[in-house]
Structures are given as structure tokens and as C-alpha cells.
Amino acid sequence: MIYPVIWQNNCVLLIDQTRLPNEYAVVEIHRSEEMARAIQTMIVRGAPAIGVAAAYGMYLGAREIETSERQEFLQKLEKVAQLLRATRPTAVNLFWAISRMLKTAYETLGTVAQIKENLLQTAQAINAEDLQTCQVIGDNGLAILPKTPTKLTLLTHCNAGALATAGYGTALGVVRSAWREGRLERLFADETRPRLQGAKLTTWECVQEGIPVTLITDNMAAHCMKQGLIDAVVVGADRIAANGDAANKIGTYSLAIVAKAHNVPFFVAAPVSTIDFELTDGSQIPIEERNPVEIYQVGDTTLTPPGVEFYNPAFDVTPAELITAIITENGAFAPCDLTKSSKQAVV
């Protein structure tokens, strides 16, 4: 199993996902500022993994605070939370994990040392819970995949695998469960421009576990569906509104439109912590814009002439009506049933 975030020897170990697939490297994180930078630069990425990393980042920040006075400690911890919140605006798991850590701090009665101890325990609990959640999501997804053919060919976008979570994955968790039960023929992976998470990360995960994988460019999906090569689409999500609108990596929306046009089921797999019940619909989801260098430069090569302007949103929002079902640890639900079926599980 692949574990992108590990607590070991009083520090956090992160798989450096910016170096995959050509180099497997592990980065040690000792301070909250280092964690914020790792999240911002996508050394660690994927909404659930970011949440786990942020939880540990909160503990690292708490560990750095040198005071025994409770109120002063909590004020400084709020500044750590502010630092981490500013890293990635779209992934709601980040904010959820930070809020849970703050709740632990404020509700702990006792010394500052006891608060710090409880914060570490909470971060470790978030880590363990996410791993278990992903395994359940995988099995819940397997249960609602099309029954025919016996062996399915699935298509995914970006990387919603073990690297994007505490382990196992959400969308790739469904793929893993299907592979384990003999129900997967092959996975098609979109390359996912501009950062190529599908090409670099999803294919890498599949190769590690012997899962048959075929890489395609993003603009090949419609052709593959027309040729009858795809039985279902399974993607992850970074934030889901109460009505079922789902924000995921840029290109997911167009993939959902194409799937609808070809009568291919389109599933979103995500933990309940990704659902933001405070947002009525997807128009309220903040969309991160990243450095345009991701578009116009590959390595040291610039692809465009001078004078070109760029627009680089990292995410788009897929309307609920294009989604067949949202797969959570509580089961799989039609988007219209999301609130009544899942809200009680939100911490």
C-alpha cells in the first residue's frame, strides 16, 4: 500500500509527488511553515491527503509555540491555522481538518502540554480514519458499478488514489476494489493537463500494483466512449456543495458532459468530509488559480510566443445533474439525496 503522509520519529514524512514517476523521494517536515509550503507547491496534494497533512501541520505549529499560558497559546494556534488555510482554497478537507484540530484545542481542559498531546492524537486519528474511509468508499463504489460486462473498463481523471488520500484512494479506491474482486478489465487514465497528475501519478500507482492501465490525452475521452471502450467514469472531488455540484480537477466538467452524451455512468467518489453543507450549490465554491507557468512551460522549454495571456484555473465544477451517484463511506447517493443521507456523519 502507498502512504503519502506518515508520522514517524516526531516528524511528518511526505512522498514528494512533484518528483514522481521518475524519482521516489521522501521529504521530512518538522515545522508548520514547511507543511504549508509542501501543500502550496503540491509536494502533497489531493483533498483528503491535504486534510491529513494540514492536521499534522497544526500539531507541528502547536509544538513550536513556547508558552504555558492557555489563551496566548490558542491565539498563536489560530495564526498557524490561518497560515495553513491560505495554501489551497478549493479543497474543503483542508478547512475541515483545521477546524477539527482547533476544536480539539479549545475543548481540551488542562495544560498547554495536554493540548499539544491531544492535537497529535487528533491528527493521527484523522489519518487513520481517512484510510479506513477510503477502503469503505472503494467497496461501496464496487457495489454500484454496472453489472455488465463482468469485467469493466473504467476511466478516471487526475489522481484520486492512495497518493491523494491517507492511502487506498477514493476514485482509485473503487478501481482497487474492482481489481481485487476480479471485476476490472482495465483502467483508462486521462493525462490531466496541465500538471499531468493522471500521467505521472495515477499510472504510477497502477504500475506499482499490477493494475492494467492505458494512458490517454484529455481530448481522447469522447472518442474512446464513442468506440465503446469505457463502461463507467469514476473521479474524485475536492469540494461538493449541498446540492451535489462537485469541484474536481479542471477537465472533470467536460468529461462529465461527454459521459452524459454517450450514456456512460459518471460517479464521484469522496468522503463525507469533502461535502460542504454550508454551500447551497457549486457557484459558491472558490476556484484556485495557479501560476500560468504550468501551462506555457514544460521543463525548461517555453511553448508559447511572447505576448500571450494565460488563464489557469485548477478546478471546475460539475453540475449535479451530470453525476450518476456520489460514493461516500455512508453509501452511494444520488446528488439530490446527499444532504439527508450524509449530513449526520459530518464531524
Swiss-Prot record:
Q: Which UniProt keywords apply?
A: Amino-acid biosynthesis, Isomerase, Methionine biosynthesis
UniProt-listed Gene3D superfamilies:
translation initiation factor eif-2b, domain 1 (1.20.120.420), Translation initiation factor eif-2b, domain 2 (3.40.50.10470)
Q: Which residues form the active site?
A: D238
According to UniProt, the reaction catalysed is:
5-(methylsulfanyl)-alpha-D-ribose 1-phosphate = 5-(methylsulfanyl)-D-ribulose 1-phosphate
A Pfam family of this chain:
IF-2B
User: EC no.?
Assistant: 5.3.1.23
Q: Which domain of life is it from?
A: Bacteria
Q: Where does substrate bind?
A: R45, G46, A47, R88, Q197, N248, K249
Pathway where this protein functions? Amino-acid biosynthesis; L-methionine biosynthesis via salvage pathway; L-methionine from S-methyl-5-thio-alpha-D-ribose 1-phosphate: step 1/6
Gene Ontology process terms (BP): L-methionine salvage from methylthioadenosine
Q: Where is this site: Transition state stabilizer?
A: C158
Molecular functions per Gene Ontology:
S-methyl-5-thioribose-1-phosphate isomerase activity
* NCBIfam families attached to this UniProt entry: eIF-2B_rel, PRK05720.1, salvage_mtnA
Function, in words: Catalyzes the interconversion of methylthioribose-1-phosphate (MTR-1-P) into methylthioribulose-1-phosphate (MTRu-1-P).
Q: Which family does the similarity line name? A: Belongs to the eIF-2B alpha/beta/delta subunits family. MtnA subfamily.
List the HAMAP family: Salvage_MtnA
Q: What is this protein called?
A: Methylthioribose-1-phosphate isomerase
